[in-house]
Design a protein with these regions (language model features):
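C-terminal capping segment of individual leucine-rich repeats
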Residues: 17, 41-44, 68-71, 95-98, ...
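Short, solvent-exposed loop/turn at the beta-strand->alpha-helix junction
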Residues: 4-8, 29-37, 56-64, 84-91, ...
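N-terminal segments that cap or nucleate solenoid repeat domains
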Residues: 1-51, 57
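Compositionally biased, intrinsically disordered low-complexity segments
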Residues: 10, 48-51, 88, 93, ...
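Structural register of leucine-rich repeats
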Residues: 22-24, 37, 46-49, 64, ...
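Concave beta-strand-loop units of leucine-rich repeat
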Residues: 24-31, 51-57, 72, 79-84, ...
C-alpha cells in the first residue's frame, strides 16, 4: 500500500460536501484503493453512517479494507456505484462482523456476478439489511 498523505483533508472536504458529520461523500474527489485503505484506518470516520464513493474504479482491495476496519461501527449505508469491487469484494463485505449496523448496500455497476450475489444471499452478517441494489451487474 502506498502511503496516502492527505486522507484527513479529504475526510474534512467530504464532510463539507455532505454538510453533516454522518455522511461522507467522495463522489467528486479523486479516490483510489490506497485512499480507501487509509480512510478505513482513520479515527475521523467513527461517526459516519453513510459512505458514498461512486465512479472511482475501487476494487476488492477497497472492499477488504472496509470489511476489516474497526473505524466504521456506525456505518448504515454504503453506496459504491460504478466501481469494480466484483465477487471477491462483495464476499469480504458479506462476511464481515465489523459492519454490524449496515442496512443499505448499493453496488450497481460493480462487475458482480452470480458468486457475489450468492455471498450476499448466504450471509449471516447482513440480517439487518433492508435495501440492496445490484442493478447493472452480471447477475
Amino acid at each position: 500500500m502506498k502511503k496516502y498523505y492527505n486522507i484527513e483533508g479529504m475526510i474534512r472536504n467530504g464532510y463539507k460536501l455532505s454538510r453533516d458529520y454522518q455522511t461522507l461523500d467522495f463522489s467528486y474527489a479523486r479516490f483510489s484503493d490506497d485512499a480507501m485503505q487509509a480512510l478505513a484506518k482513520s479515527r475521523s470516520v467513527k461517526q459516519v453512517r453513510r459512505l458514498i464513493i461512486t465512479g472511482k474504479k475501487l476494487t476488492a482491495i477497497s472492499a477488504q479494507a472496509l470489511a476489516e476496519s474497526n473505524c466504521l461501527p456506525n456505518l448504515e449505508s454504503l453506496k459504491l456505484y460504478k466501481n469494480k469491487i466484483g465477487d471477491e469484494g462483495v464476499k469480504y463485505l458479506a462476511e464481515t462482523e465489523k459492519l454490524p449496523n449496515i442496512k443499505t448496500l448499493r453496488f450497481a455497476w460493480n462487475d458482480i456476478g452470480p458468486e457475489g450475489a450468492r455471498s450476499l444471499a448466504d450471509s449471516s452478517q447482513l440480517g439487518g439489511l433492508i435495501s440492496l441494489v445490484l442493478s447493472d451487474n452480471q447477475i
